[in-house]
């Protein structure tokens, strides 16, 4: 089989060996520099196990005593390459879901931690954040994870406030194999956020070939987070962009293309501000469905679609559900949204279409899209 890994130029093969200057402005609800703060210890990991070992060591003081929340802030640069595992999984899609998941767990670590992939690195394992805070995950290329039937998420944020998921590439196959539990678990989610994971920012990620992109809440009783999704590029994905259960979602400057099931699904009385995005070739791009009640509401502002007459121009279609549902097929706002509690400067939807693919994902030196680039 032809390799799925695109050759990388010599310039991009330079590892991100030094942490960037600390920054707490994520363009969203999260305000964190992760581990990149005063007193941070920087380490390099060449494998998944190295990351595990480095985090374990950071839990202990100089005397080997465990410190609650971690002994020191931590910046880990991951230089490993698992292209061979990714390509093998891509060649045997239906052989992955029943395997055990692979992942790094960041549990009860509140001192601050950043995991940043070196350019040219890749991972066939997930990053699972639980009961932690001030965590940043950047420039990680994660794909075709095993364990779809065993909660094998690429990135999972569980009971963890102040998390920033930024400039990653997350990918699998938008396909369902026969015989999987619930007929829905060939691969698990790209980014699931649940529990007490308030103030999270998901930005500049390139997410493609994923059936279930991401939860905002694990059940109808798991509600109430504030999450920002901005400058993400979604292509050939099925649904959950996100599946929002309650709380607030601010989605701005995202590019949604080739959406095969549904896009932003605002449920359980959630409120969404959907601003300056570009939608094309999308089924049910904004909807509230599957619960049959407690429909969420949205404010539509500055998107490329402004009226139903635009649907044919951008290949937007709508479907019904067996339960009561609400689609944005009149393309009007259905509610209100509170004043956004952070500074942000969205570019136009047209600029998102034209420029965002050059900024989202890995190997972009964490560059951000500004109005200057739109001229």
From Swiss-Prot:
Gene Ontology CC: one annotated term: extracellular region
Binding site for Ca(2+): 151, 153, 188, 192
Transmembrane segments: none
Keyword Transit peptide in record: no
Needed co-factor(s): Ca(2+)
Cofactor detail note: Binds 1 Ca(2+) ion per subunit.
GO molecular-function term, one example from the UniProt record: metal ion binding
Keyword Nucleotide-binding among UniProt keywords: no
Residues of the active site: 240
GO annotation terms (biological process): pectin catabolic process
Cystine connections: 94-177, 351-374
Top-level EC class: lyase
Localization per Swiss-Prot or TrEMBL: Secreted
Domain of life: Bacteria
Catalytic function, reaction form: Eliminative cleavage of (1->4)-alpha-D-galacturonan to give oligosaccharides with 4-deoxy-alpha-D-galact-4-enuronosyl groups at their non-reducing ends
Signal sequence coordinates: 1-22
Enzyme Commission (EC) number: 4.2.2.2
InterPro entries named in the record: Pec_lyase, Pectin_lyas_fold, Pectin_lyase_fold/virulence, PEL
Family per record: Belongs to the polysaccharide lyase 1 family. PLADES subfamily.
Function (record text): Involved in maceration and soft-rotting of plant tissue.
Name under which the protein is recorded: Pectate lyase C
